[in-house]
From Swiss-Prot:
One of its GO terms (molecular function) is zinc ion binding. The keyword S-adenosyl-L-methionine does not apply. GO terms for cellular component: cytosol. Zn(2+) binds at C98, C101, C116, C119. A divalent metal cation 3 binds at E174, E178, E219. Its EC number is 3.6.1.-, 3.6.1.22. A motif (Nudix box) lies at residues 159-180. Gene3D superfamilies: 3.90.79.20, Nucleoside Triphosphate Pyrophosphohydrolase. InterPro entries: NAD-cap_RNA_hydrolase_NudC, NudC-like_C, NUDIX_hydrolase-like_dom_sf, NUDIX_hydrolase_CS, NUDIX_hydrolase_dom, RNA_Hydrolase_NudC, Znr_NADH_PPase. A divalent metal cation 1 binds at A158, E178, E219. Keywords: Hydrolase, Magnesium, Manganese, Metal-binding, NAD, Zinc. This is NAD-capped RNA hydrolase NudC.
Length: 257
């Protein structure tokens, strides 16, 4: 439940509006509320990090509003909490009125939800499940450059899970649609909340089965097999894509060195 910020309140401050994050001096604000002109605003505690509270403040600032991507190099847990704050702020902003009856809604006191004051409908933050998969063929890994990433970064394949589809089916479909190949021996690795805008990445490793690379030009600029010791520019550390690539490289080193 949110409350009014007092002078001595302290912690990490996720100040967000319209999926933007306030980053004075390029950093996530930390310290006493008075230092950031937050006293008197409403705040909701959304977690803790290193024993300090993490607060969400739904507010637009005139300057230094940026993307949560700018704090991706933070500790993984703090980055996740910043992402949670941005997603919750957008959820509360976009769910002021009920989609069924049009009446005003109010936040739940017990969970991340909005409740309709008229028809009692309950809304939760939208989470979009996605798959991301590293595909290995002998001593090489399949890496692609996506159309939305024109900075030279090559990464593994990923995509959204469709309605009525299992995660395993989503992997097979996305890989076939984007690269034209089939995979086998699928293995779950880990997951990562990814607030761009509200994804939950489920990470897998797989082995090449059959087929030649035929890219979907709407999704990819190019895709190729890269030997584990001769890789192109990769996603930054801290991303689940980077972990999948590094895990695949480690497996190749164990077998080929």
């Amino acid at each position: 439940m949110d409350r009014i910020i007092e002078k001595l309140d302290h912690g990490w401050w996720v100040v967000s509006h319209e999926q933007k994050l306030w980053l004075p001096k390029g950093e996530l604000p930390y310290g006493e509320a008075a230092n950031f002109d937050l006293v008197g605003q409403r705040a909701l505690q959304i977690g803790e990090w290193q024993g300090e509270p993490v607060w969400l403040v739904q507010q637009q600032r005139r300057h230094d509003m940026g993307s949560v991507r700018q704090v991706i190099d933070l500790d993984v847990r703090l980055f996740q909490l910043a992402g949670r704050g941005v997603q919750l702020a957008e959820f509360y902003r976009s769910h002021k009125y009920c989609g069924y009856c049009g009446h005003e809604m109010y936040p739940s006191k017990t969970e991340w939800a909005m409740l309709c004051s008229h028809c009692r409908e309950r809304y939760y933050p939208q989470i979009a499940p996605c798959i991301i998969v590293a595909i290995r063929r002998d001593d090489s890994i399949l890496l692609a450059q996506h159309t939305r990433h024109r900075n030279g970064v090559h990464t593994v394949l990923a995509g959204f899970v469709e309605v009525g589809e299992t995660l395993e089916q989503a992997v097979a479909r996305e890989v076939m649609e984007e690269s034209g190949i089939k995979v086998k021996n699928l293995r779950y690795v880990t997951s990562q909340p990814w607030p761009f805008p509200q994804s939950l990445m489920t990470a897998f490793m797989a082995e090449y089965d059959s087929g030649d690379i035929v890219i979907d030009p709407k999704e990819l600029l190019e895709a190729n097999w890269y030997r584990y010791d001769d890789l192109p520019l990769l996603p930054p550390p801290g991303t689940v894509a980077r972990r999948l690539i590094e895990d695949t490289v480690a497996m190749c080193r164990a077998e080929y060195e």
